[in-house]
Amino acid sequence: MVPPGKKPAGEASNSNKKCKRYFNEHWKEEFTWLDFDYERKLMFCLECRQALVRNKHGKAENAFTVGTDNFQRHALLRHVTSGAHRQALAVNQGQPPFEGQAEGGGACPGLATTPASRGVKVELDPAKVAVLTTVYCMAKEDVPNDRCSALLELQRFNLCQALLGTEHGDYYSPRRVRDMQVAIASVLHTEACQRLKASPYVGLVLDETRDWPESHSLALFATSVSPCDGQPATTFLGSVELQEGEATAGQLLDILQAFGVSAPKLAWLSSSLPSERLGSVGPQLRATCPLLAELHCLPGRTDPEPPAYLGQYESILDALFRLHGGPSSHLVPELRAALDLAAIDLAGPRPVPWASLLPVVEAVAEAWPGLVPTLEAAALASPVAGSLALALRQFTFVAFTHLLLDALPSVQKLSLVLQAEEPDLALLQPLVMAAAASLQAQRGSGGARLQGFLQELASMDPDASSGRCTYRGVELLGYSEAAVRGLEWLRGSFLDSMRKGLQDSYPGPSLDAVAAFAAIFDPRRYPQAPEELGTHGEGALRVLLRGFAPAVVRQRALGDFALFKRVVFGLGRLGPRALCTQLACAHSELHELFPDFAALAALALALPAGAGLLDKVGRSRELRWWGQSGAGEGRGGHMVKIAVDGPPLHEFDFGLAVEFLESGWGEGFLGSQLT
């Protein structure tokens, strides 16, 4: 059924394929410029269409002028703050462009408009937009700057009308690609500042990058929540060089302050830095950020004090996969399949954490009996193959592979949960506890795979004096009682390191808070009948009231809780993200009825986890590496900003980019704080 007050949307637009949405009649009351064509099922902006009529030579370049079926409230909010809408308002009021403020009822508290334009024309020059869109797409797709001339020439050859006219000044010369990138990034930076200022709470994410062996830098991301529609977002802030290998709390707070984020708003800290490198940053931040909790969900975080053999083992796997796992190798298909399954790019800039990838370890274990003779057969032609064959025959290598097969599955389950678009927070604490318990049990008695391997060797009564025995038809080297004792020490050291890494990444108080969020904001976990609600979630609420005391009024929250549960129960089986979004939206009834639960919902939405964050971190890792273009050209922060945060082409405000470029307003804007 179509919900009351809403009209069927027909086929969703390309930006909205995942779920069918509907036009909401209430939007017309909030956004006075909004019109809806009930026959064509399209939304229009009256101001933009009127401005198009007044400006007879203008072009219908935005979706709300030609009509859009993107029935999402954030699309309306984005339009009302866009340069095109502000220009339309100025034209309709007979003012120079950008001098008027958007007067639609949809203006959102905390979202300031950009600085007034300095003489930009109402009608955007199509040639300027064509060049800027080319530069924008180049940055999004990591195309080197020196290809700009060729791409523009290709478009002229294909009769791109906007580029067939005369030149439009030195601003838009291919020699000024970097200046155009800075202007584009300045638009994104301005939007990021507005977004972070408006967000009630913010999460900070630190991702370490080693650009050179002796150079360390941090990429900074922020998670935020829009009070306009309750939607969470992840923003790339930039990179900062680490001084003496450590980040300082003062540095981080200064950067956040530059984006308009005060210390009391910082609620979450997440990092790929190992605990010994993160140092005292967490405690220092907590001294000035009373809400701060730590939860380190980024992949690639190394465990503290790993045994030295771990590095040796990963070096063997790295050499093996580079020799026989590449696209040109057909000798060992299991290795190629494992790379594809684990989404590993051997040409990538970062070291591959081979020993933490279960598909890789499983592939090595499965292919091992055939790998050794294959490598030995290639030894005459490749010295590397001969060395690898010898390494793979070693007892310790095979035993450590079985140790990983026992230890990794429980940690893998945790990783998969965190990779979801909307992670199921209720599973986080049980999975962490189960993984820690599994590692502790293996510490005491050994896992099933390792014990089975050792028992099979012991039953063969090998020649202890030679240290030789046979496993799966392949002769092992280095097997002895001393080697078994050394393996016991290695097992204990490795499992202790993994367990300590879990404790560092998922501190107990933070896990308690996440479990409490799930108990309160996941209606699917409520009792089946309203009369059974009773004391459900009371313990969880008290956990949150203690942990986030500055954000809530304790007695009011306790008094509202019974009514809150009944209202949520009556809404049906909403998912936690949907419920939290409704609560965090400043215009919703739930937000007004339950302000304390609205604050807690915003805190839950700002939690740095999920596919959206991981995608942006992964993209920035690809780009923040020297010579990625193949010509030794470094990737500046403005290019990474565009590639990571740039919206789809039709959503970007090129009018504002023109303003920044020609006025010089964006120069130095980004580099003043970050690179």
From Swiss-Prot:
Pfam families: zf-C17orf113. It comes from the Eukaryota. PANTHER family: RAS-ASSOCIATING DOMAIN-CONTAINING PROTEIN, U1-TYPE DOMAIN-CONTAINING PROTEIN. This is Uncharacterized protein C17orf113. The lineage of its organism: Eukaryota, Metazoa, Chordata, Craniata, Vertebrata.
